[in-house]
Structures are given as structure tokens and as C-alpha cells.
């Protein structure tokens, strides 16, 4: 067997596919990140070792703001290139919807670096608008107001506009137009109104229903005409500045985007023909991320196009429509939050322990006292061959089921059941190995790897840190961050530490295809074994919940300066005290209640005074500790 190399690991985990030049494997066999154009490599294992010296324990979320900056620059440069190629004569604006990641340090970094790149912010709710207006105080960047709106939302937006903010209020429902008109007249403001149009076109992938006739938001063609009539009657025709459409997030197929763009461009043309001088088109979101690195339109975790191709289609479609109809090119807005934010965050978790299925030692042989079914299964195991692999599988299944039934009725003993189970799983392992060499693998054997996988128990909550993995079976790139110059000899599923059977990951992107298990190494004594979960910067932090009261993980900001990495900030993960307060417990009251109980127990002689003090000390220190295992 040839020696394992880091090139083998690169291929196995397809890091060159999903890493998009940000992630790789160094000569030490560790995963590195390259956040900047200067190609400075940050060894993630080195980072974890330094954090351990600072008493920072996993799980930890590593944020690389330089990657955010690079994604902004990359998207802007794609627009610049397309504008030159298609002689685009208007402005383009990249807008970050903060619902993608509302964490203050992330939003502030995007705003700060995005100022020179026409980067704006989108708010989809009243709380988001409150955040956006405040952090954008010193900027004249565009603010897009989406989502459902009431009178106070609209008043806040209009007053901000009156003070100089470039705000567009997008009408999602007809009744919002009435409120906008009323508040604008009251405040003496000429509003910048946008209208979200419900296209017939829809996206592809997990969020396909976000667009098309079944979409939640937007005005139909008939409602659009009604809105235009309302604007005319209120003498607000010139307030209509923008049209907006959105066909879904993470669109996997470029053809769906092209179809939607063509449809939307005709709305722009028709409005101009009707005398409405709309000068902005918001193309919404949808620019996807290649999570599995396959560039496959058939994978819901991938996309079959690049940022440049997406941008080219956006600009070309509207330039072509405008030129054909002799109308101005529109200013184009894209809300590509997932593409901007996904790559900048890496979740690092440590493996606590492992569990494997029992296997029969190779030297085992049944004796004269063994049950006949043990002898029968041993005969199958001893004579396995590729020719009869499916028949052997069926026979082994039948024997196991028969023994389980006999055990349930008290007919066979525990020793017989244990021998059958261990031998059955040994048979399964060998059948799986044999089936890999078959030209046509029987359908029943295709998922046998799912049955055989080890369980690697990791110190994290799936529901808190990777909610999309649980909720919609989103695939994220996952791999060990060390020992990648060694051959991984085990295959495992990942189990979290919640008391929930759903707290597991059993779908992985490996070797350019999806697998039910992840290739991993056996654990070494007294050595931490870390797994990295990549591309988690979009939606995961903010969607995470406190199942089993596991709180936010520690977040660490790492930047590159003068060719070296620097740990800029450490945001401590939530403590037990903090999560208890979320669910309306008063930690001080809890301590007082325990003090009374302990005093009573000491008085009754159930524990000593020293034991009582030790108990209260442990309880108090636990309240102020990390919600995860330390």
C-alpha cells in the first residue's frame, strides 16, 4: 500500500473544490487558511494551540475579517469587469442583507471595508432597521428596507431619509403603499419607493419556493397596476425609483437566474414605456456558494456558475433590454449576503470519544457447545466471496433477525446474542469491502457504509452551531484540521452532546460526492483531535437555538498583519448563568434556594459542612462557566 500524502487528503476531502483558494493543507498535515492576497497562511491547528494557552476551549468559531474584505473586493471587481465588457453606463451596488449574519463585529467590518465599493445594507425587519440606521450613521451608503412594515417602521425610515440617509422603502404588500404615502406627507419627505414584483420565474435548490407564484412576498402584475394607479392618484409617480425581485437563496442553476433576469428586465422596460422613470433594479439574493465543491447543478449544496458569470448575466440582461428600447441603463443592486459571508467563519470542534460497532476477533471459531445459528453465521463469514455477496448478506440478515426474536422470547442466552451481533457486523464489514470491487453494486448494499460508521462524539450543539444541517440537511465541508499526512482509517458520523437523536451529521462532501460517513483518524491518547466545519459564516450563528440550553460558542477574530496572524478579539461564549436568564431563571435566586437546602441538609446530618461548601462552590463556578464541556 502506497504511503499516504497530503495530496491524497486534498482529493479525499475535496478542499481544492470548496476551499476557493482560502483553505488548503500544509506540509505538516494541518489545514491552513489564506485570508489575504499576500498569501499569508494561518495554520488552524496552531491557532487552536495558542487559544488553549489562553484558556479558550472548543467549540470555537474562528472569524477571518480579511476574507470578508476579500469577498467584497472580488464581487466588486467582477462587476467592474462586466461593466467594462458590456459598456454599462450606470452604477452597481452590492448590498449585504444583515439577516445573513447580524453579529455586530461582522456587520461593522462589512460596512467599514465596503464604503469604497458602493456597499449598502438591507434590513428586513424593524429590529434590523434600528441596527442598520445606527451603524450606518457616518455613511451615505444605500439602505434597502424590505420585509413587513408598520407605521413606526416606515416613519423611522423616512425620518432617517430626511436626515440624509439614502433609503429605499420596498413595498411588499399593497397596504404598505398607503402608509408610506400618509407618513411621507406628514413628515414632508419625498420617499424613495421600491416595489417588489412577484415573478413567475423561480429559483432552484432548497429555496425554490421563495420565488414564483407560491412566493411569500411581492406584488402580482395586477397588484402592480393597482399600485401604479395609487401612486398616480396621490401625485407620487416620480417617487417610484426601484423595482425588486427575489427568486430564492442558494440558486444552484444559472439558467434559472437568466430566466428571472429576462422576465424582470421586461418589467423595467414596461414601466419606462408607461412613463415611470425607475432608475434602480434590485436583483435580490440567490448568488450561491459551492459548499461541496462539485460545481454541480444537481446538488442542492453546490452551484454550476461563478460570481463573474452571475454578474455578467445581471449586467448584460439589463444593458441589452435598455439598449433595445432606448431607455437608460438601471443602477443594479444585488443582495448577495451568503456569498459575501459564508467563507469567513470556521467552526472548530473537538472529539470527546468514539463508539464503534462490535466485531468478532478473527481467531474466533465456534465450538461444539455453540448455538447452531452461531455455526451457520460463522460458515457464511468464513466463505464470503464477491460472487455470492448479496446472497450472503441476505442470509446473515435472516440469522440475526432470528436470533433477536429468539432472545426476546427467552430461547437463546445473552452470550449467543452477543456472538451473533459481533459476527454479523464483521460480515457486514467484509461485504462492504468486497462490494467496492463490484462493477455493479446491488442497491441493497449501497448504504451499508451508513450502518457501519463509527460515532465520533464532539463537543458542540448541532442546533446551536449548524442549524441548517439539522433543519434542511445542508451539507457543510467538514474535515480533520490535523494529521492529514496520515491515512484516515476509520469512517464516522458526527454526534453532538445534546440529548437528542437528531443531533448528528451523517451527510458529508468527500471525494467530489456525498457520503454517509466522514473519513477520520483513530484518536491518540492525550492529544486533542479537532474537526473543522467550514463555510459557516452565513445564517448559522443567528439561526442557532438553545436546545438543551447550549449557548453561543466562543468567537475569535483573527487578522493578518505584516505576514503574521493576530488574534484581535475573543468574544467569550455564553455562560450557564446567561442561558438560564434567557429562559427566565434568576441565577441569584437559584443560589439562594440551594444555600437554604444545603444548610438544611447539613443540619439533618445528610452531608458535612465541608461537603455543603464544596457543593455550593461547584454550583457557583458552574454558573459562570461555559455551557459546553470543559
Tell me what each language-model feature is.
Residues 87-282, 287-289, 304-309, 317, ...:
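Active-site-proximal beta-alpha core segment in soluble small-molecule metabolic enzymes
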Residues 20, 25-102:
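Low-complexity, highly charged intrinsically disordered N-terminal segments
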Residues 66-74, 226, 263, 313:
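A non-catalytic, amphipathic alpha-helix used as a structural packing/dimerization or gating element
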Residues 7-9, 73-81, 104-109, 129-130, ...:
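Short alpha-helical segments and helix-capping/turn motifs at coil-helix boundaries
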Residues 58, 62, 84-89, 274-278, ...:
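Flexible, glycine/charged-enriched surface loops at secondary-structure junctions
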Residues 1-31:
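Charged, compositionally biased N-terminal leader segments and the immediate start
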Residues 313, 319-630:
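Charged (often Lys/Glu-rich) extended helix/loop segments that serve as interaction or gating elements
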